[in-house]
UniProtKB/Swiss-Prot annotation:
Required for rescue of stalled ribosomes mediated by trans-translation. Binds to transfer-messenger RNA (tmRNA), required for stable association of tmRNA with ribosomes. tmRNA and SmpB together mimic tRNA shape, replacing the anticodon stem-loop with SmpB. tmRNA is encoded by the ssrA gene; the 2 termini fold to resemble tRNA(Ala) and it encodes a 'tag peptide', a short internal open reading frame. During trans-translation Ala-aminoacylated tmRNA acts like a tRNA, entering the A-site of stalled ribosomes, displacing the stalled mRNA. Residues 119-147 are annotated as: Disordered. The keyword Cytoplasm applies. HAMAP family: SmpB. InterPro entries: SmpB, SsrA-bd_prot. Residues 126-147 have a biased composition (Basic and acidic residues). This is SsrA-binding protein. The gene is smpB. It holds the Pfam family SmpB. GO terms for biological process: trans-translation. Transmembrane segments: none annotated. The lineage of its organism: Bacteria, Pseudomonadati, Pseudomonadota, Betaproteobacteria, Nitrosomonadales. It comes from the Bacteria. Belongs to the SmpB family.
Length: 147
């Protein structure tokens, strides 16, 4: 069940692989994400010292859940993956011109997980072509629908 989706990522990138990662979150962040108060629109994933970090994900704190601390809505959050997965992703990102983008935040067995995609950027004409293809699929469905 998806909590937050990054639709802009599918518009701006060709997603080639998807990976599920855990995230190191604080208590107030978990409560806010469960309430749907997170945004992935301008978020991205970087590699630092062989670890993955989520940058730019905005989590608006709940007033009731964050009274005793000073919450930082856009703090850097560490992502948790197996070491082999991280090594493979680092190799592709550094060598082949790929980037890592967050696709959505969802639950899995009661835990909050982040789906990241190994992606290649789209050019402007690729974006136009994708949009034309989507429109054609919608028109096809509309024409095939019984009246």
């Amino acid at each position: 069940m998806s909590i937050v989706q990054n639709k802009k990522a599918f518009h701006d990138y060709f997603i080639e692989e998807k990976h599920e990662a855990g995230a190191v979150l604080e208590g107030w962040e978990v409560k806010a994400i469960r309430a749907g108060r997170a945004q992935l629109k301008e978020a991205y994933v970087i590699i630092r010292n062989g670890e993955l970090f989520l940058i730019g994900c905005h989590v608006s704190p709940l007033l009731a859940a964050s009274t005793h601390i000073q919450p930082d809505p856009v703090r850097t959050r560490k992502l948790l993956l197996h070491a082999e997965e991280i090594k493979r992703l680092i190799g592709k990102v550094e060598r082949a011109g790929y980037t890592l983008v967050p696709l959505d935040i969802h639950y899995k067995k009661g835990r909050i997980k982040l789906e990241i995609g190994l992606a290649k950027g789209k050019k402007q004409h690729d974006k136009r072509e994708s949009e034309k293809q989507k429109e054609w699929e919608r028109d096809k469905q509309r024409l095939m629908r019984p009246k």
